[in-house]
């Protein structure tokens, strides 16, 4: 039995042999990837995972690969840029694992890190490449990897390895990294990840409006109506002319019948740009929905005077006149009703000319106008048209 035990390989001896072999490889300045494989092979055995020397050799082997690729890139030699960035991220990951072991107290409770200072100083020089990698992968539309690199960049701030650098307070690029994380998560249609770094991303003031858009979309996907609207209102208050926030606020208020709120939004937008045909038309529609037909018609006429080729102001004015006519008594106010229909007619006929494919909109209105004006030929034509649409 004793002889058998002596013949069996000793785990510690095998470990020392592979560590020694890896050191020899690294000294030769060649085959760093082989040295890395030796160390990752040792770490498959859970008994080796507390040995910081293994992690130190692993770190050195990745560092050597990183430096070799970096030198080729510097010399403008053909090299896989994505591989270089992956080596960067792996270097940080290994260093952080090593640091967690390095900071463990000894048997007397003393903490005396052996590697932290040198590794942290070295990695701080490489850290910008984590953010460069993020931007690189965004441009490649590889948003999953872009997100991972932006997180790796920001994560340094919470890692004890970099505690002495106070990254949370002095790193001015942290909001930029948070923005790219938010954007990448948005492009992956992951609402939870989109919102994860929102507070930090909002500190990148050059991209605040975009961040708020991504936040709004995330909250919409999460069906959180109150926070969705809160985000839309915040974005609109910052920039009333932004093409994202205005139409969505208007759509929401219109769908919920809150015309007063919709009017408030469009009036605020007009304060920012009083000549916008979009905002003027939106206001005419709100006024129509509120039953303020004369104001709707006046505003539609203003829009037509600005641009007589826009179809929708004609429709708003024509239907406003129609609704005014419908409020009149068909017997006691017959003459007045006919006059209103006569006013509605040119608007709706012009709308038909400008939007011939919108038959379901102008067809029923012209049907009622021609009927009440006793315009037999025109009425018959519209009547036949509507029958084909049924």
Regions found by a protein language model. Name each.
Residues 46-49, 158, 205-206, 240-241, ...:
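Short coil turns that delineate tetratricopeptide repeat
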Residues 235, 323, 338-390:
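Terminal, low-structured helical/coil segments at or just beyond the last alpha-helical repeat
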Residues 43-44, 155, 200-203, 233-238, ...:
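Conserved structural position within tetratricopeptide repeats
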Residues 29, 64-74, 139-141, 161, ...:
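Short coil/turn linking the two alpha-helices of tandem helical-hairpin repeats
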Residues 54, 162-166, 177, 210-212, ...:
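TPR alpha-solenoid repeat register
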Residues 26-142:
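Post-signal peptide N-terminal segment of secreted/secretory-pathway proteins
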Residues 35, 88-91, 146, 194, ...:
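Single-residue signature of alpha-solenoid repeat helices
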Residues 21-22, 58, 62-65, 126, ...:
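Structural register within alpha-helical repeat arrays
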């Amino acid at each position: 039995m004793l002889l058998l035990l002596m013949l069996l390989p000793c785990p510690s001896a095998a470990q020392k042999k592979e560590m020694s072999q890896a050191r020899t490889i690294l000294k030769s300045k060649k085959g760093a990837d082989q040295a890395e494989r030796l160390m990752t092979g040792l770490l498959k055995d859970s008994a080796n995972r507390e040995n910081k020397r293994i992690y130190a050799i692993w770190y050195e082997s990745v560092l050597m690969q990183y430096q070799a690729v970096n030198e080729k890139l510097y010399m403008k030699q053909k090299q896989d840029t994505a591989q270089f960035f992956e080596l960067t991220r792996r270097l940080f990951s290994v260093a952080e694992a090593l640091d967690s072991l390095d900071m463990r107290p000894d048997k007397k409770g003393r903490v005396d890190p052996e590697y932290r200072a040198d590794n942290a100083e070295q990695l701080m020089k490489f850290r910008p490449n984590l953010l460069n990698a993020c931007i690189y992968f965004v441009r490649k539309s590889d948003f999953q990897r872009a997100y991972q690199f932006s997180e790796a960049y920001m994560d340094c701030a919470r890692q004890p390895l970099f505690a002495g650098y106070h990254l949370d307070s002095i790193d001015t690029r942290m909001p930029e990294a948070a923005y790219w994380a938010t954007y990448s998560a948005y492009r992956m249609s992951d609402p939870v990840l989109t919102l994860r770094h929102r507070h930090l991303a909002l500190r990148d003031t050059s991209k605040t409006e975009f961040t708020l858009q991504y936040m709004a979309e995330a909250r919409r996907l999460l069906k959180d109506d109150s926070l969705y609207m809160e985000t839309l209102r915040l974005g609109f208050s910052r920039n009333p002319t932004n093409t994202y926030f205005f139409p969505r606020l208007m759509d929401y208020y219109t769908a919920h019948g809150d015309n007063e709120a919709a009017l408030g939004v469009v009036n605020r937008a007009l304060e920012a740009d009083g000549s916008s045909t979009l905002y003027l038309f939106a206001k005419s529609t709100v006024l129509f929905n509120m039953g303020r037909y004369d104001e709707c018609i006046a505003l539609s006429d203003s829009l037509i005077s600005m641009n007589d080729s826009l179809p929708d102001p004609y429709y708003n004015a024509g239907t406003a006149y129609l609704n005014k006519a419908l409020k009149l008594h068909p017997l006691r106010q017959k003459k007045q009703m006919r006059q209103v229909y006569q006013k509605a007619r040119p608007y709706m006929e012009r709308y038909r000319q400008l939007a011939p494919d919108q038959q379901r909109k102008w067809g029923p209105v012209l049907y009622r106008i021609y009927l009440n004006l006793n315009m037999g030929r025109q009425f018959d034509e519209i009547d036949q048209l509507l029958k084909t649409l049924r």
